[in-house]
Amino acid sequence: MENIQKLIARYPLVEDLVALKETTWFNPGATSLAQGLPYVGLTEQDVNAAHDRLARFAPYLAKAFPQTAAAGGMIESDVVAIPAMQKRLEKEYGQTIDGEMLLKKDSHLAISGSIKARGGIYEVLTHAEKLALEAGLLTTDDDYSVLLSPEFKQFFSQYSIAVGSTGNLGLSIGIMSACIGFKVTVHMSADARAWKKAKLRSHGVTVVEYEDDYGVAVEQGRKAAQSDPNCFFIDDENSRTLFLGYAVAGQRLKAQFAQQGRVVDASHPLFVYLPCGVGGGPGGVAFGLKLAFGDNVHCFFAEPTHSPCMLLGVYTGLHDAISVQDIGIDNLTAADGLAVGRASGFVGRAMERLLDGLYTLDDQTMYDMLGWLAQEEGIRLEPSALAGMAGPQRICAAAEYQQRHGFSQTQLGNATHLVWATGGGMVPEDEMEQYLAKGR
């Protein structure tokens, strides 16, 4: 406790985190893209290479997952305006939200119904390609739908994949790995929903369950993989490959906005609100957005009051050297995808200069907004996916932040507020009814 008091003396906001208060922190260390980019350790070329790899796999994905065929084997989500929800939020919070609110429906991505379909699937495909190229079974000029043949399934069945997850990452990696032909084991934390485990098992995935939180599941997955040279461990805490799979979203969104005739420039700023667990998904997406829109996009991470690992790590500068449990927070939240006590040190250090801020919200707020969105827009999400929905009203109320960035009333009126909906498209009906019943 004495250590917590010392920490609070240096970092006063920790007191609010410990008290589980809904907190907003605007990052005083935010820099321009030019200044912040070198610290990421990855470049636009890396993201372009990821884009090209996904294009090589498109013919395979279109055949393996017919639901992607219409999009030519591309796994991408719609971006939609939510004017009724915007009005509802203004009414509930008594706060005008200048500009227009949009929803990015990663919640309804093909194959696994969450943002993790981006990074998780990309890393499995990257590994499969590497093995097939090294074995001389494939060249990058081939039509990758040959990977569906029995010979390839046989080849991949010699190899296995392991991952630790609170649910959605396991779902995307499990489904994709099983489809390729890998043997796959998903190490699930106590937070993982029963339906996610059942769905994985239905695909022939081995699910190992733990009574502990996310960190333990990842550690056990890493250990199990070390003893088997043919087992590849997908490391949610440190993976650059996962990060790049998420980053592709930036260029894709830019293209979607261009199609819709939506302008993003200095006088039409873009604010993006990303739910954050360990950090890979929102970190990768934010990196991609920065490459696509430069200094005209402003990214915020959103976390549950019971799991504010990234806010704690970035705000104190301690990154993965501190966990929420170290300051007496239990890491128990209904937002199962965000129930992470220790943030990725890689993502925190890579992105700390490129984030405009982080905020927390409590479970009840997520449930309330889940209900409002279902009522107003007929869109149903899981609790984690509502974390971003609290962002626009916080930003519009933050006069000091607006002044620091020199936003005029005109700029704010022209702003786009994009809420990144991270999951919920595959939640079973009975489970969704339980969520809806908890909203006020």
From Swiss-Prot:
This is D-serine dehydratase. Pfam families: PALP. Belongs to the serine/threonine dehydratase family. DsdA subfamily. One of its GO terms (molecular function) is hydro-lyase activity. Monomer. It catalyses: D-serine = pyruvate + NH4(+). Keywords: Lyase, Pyridoxal phosphate. Transmembrane segments: none annotated. The keyword Lyase applies. Its EC number is 4.3.1.18. One of its GO terms (biological process) is D-serine catabolic process. The gene is dsdA.
